């Protein structure tokens, strides 16, 4: 069984949107409501607990929801790199993604999502990530190629951070 050591949380991304994964619950009641974090080792991370409306089979998360969570946390690894290395914001989007479902993610249980950049080749960012439990056991594994969006590189869009609170995890 593959496990992972927890990492210290060092920053929190700010969210204001209505998305299915990171949307604010008050703006999208069916959102997973994930906060995204910068981890000390340069990974991105999140903590989540799914609700019954996120299920596929009885009390099991729909694979599309877990894929969306992994896509989001892997995408945020680009912004984690920008934070850690003090780089300019670069918009990215998913080019390809593959998910391996090792065991069911259950509704009502707490899980963690983590993502990291494995390598960069030109506009391509090769990224991997996992959904794990509190013991570090892997439930879903993802690999993706993200592409930079050169037409948006000079936009005013940027990633913002917000202060950490006592309710934020200390490690993921």
Language-model features: where?
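Hydrophobic residues in beta-strands and at strand termini
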Residues: 48-50, 101, 148
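Non-catalytic linker/capping segments at the edges of enzyme domains
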Residues: 1-55, 168-172
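HotDog/MaoC-like acyl-thioester-processing domains
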Residues: 1-13, 105-107, 118-172
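Short coil/loop residues immediately preceding or within conserved phosphate-binding loops
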Residues: 31, 94-96, 124-126
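Active-site helix/loop of acyl-thioester processing domains in fatty-acid/polyketide metabolism
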Residues: 43, 61-87
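Hydrophobic beta-strand-centered segment that forms part of the acyl-chain substrate-binding groove
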Residues: 75-112
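Residues located in well-ordered beta-strands
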Residues: 35, 98-100, 112-116, 128-130, ...
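Short histidine-centered catalytic/ligand-binding loop motif
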Residues: 52-64
